[in-house]
């Protein structure tokens, strides 16, 4: 089980990312827009740099929703391999059975 602080930190980053996503996209588009003057593009870049660091999507780390584990993470299921195996062996995931051949 991961530390509660690590899980909470990641949740906080996800909330900040969602909050600033539109503003960040708008400023990023302005910095790339060739039609704008260099001064306007530079001002957009400065405003982008003033946004909170944790509002960037690259700062989010995928974590298991059950255990908080960050490694061996399945994106589609949003859980780690260990939690997946545990739930599957208990029969709590519909349609998932242990393979045998």
From Swiss-Prot:
Signal peptide: none annotated. Gene3D superfamilies: 1.10.287.1480. GO terms for biological process: translation. Keywords: Ribonucleoprotein, Ribosomal protein, RNA-binding, rRNA-binding. It comes from the Bacteria. Disulfide bonds: none annotated. Part of the 30S ribosomal subunit. Contacts proteins S3 and S10. Belongs to the universal ribosomal protein uS14 family. This is Small ribosomal subunit protein uS14. The gene is rpsN.
């Amino acid at each position: 089980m991961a530390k509660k602080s690590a899980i909470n930190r990641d949740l906080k980053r996800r909330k900040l990312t969602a909050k600033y996503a539109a503003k960040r996209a708008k400023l990023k588009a302005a910095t790339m827009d060739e039609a704008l003057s260099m001064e306007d593009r530079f001002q957009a870049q400065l405003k982008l740099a003033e946004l909170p660091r944790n509002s960037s999507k690259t700062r989010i780390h995928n974590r298991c929703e059950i255990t908080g584990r960050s490694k061996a993470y399945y994106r589609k299921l949003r859980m780690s391999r260990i939690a997946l195996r545990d739930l599957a062996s208990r029969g709590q995931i519909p349609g998932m059975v242990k393979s045998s051949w």
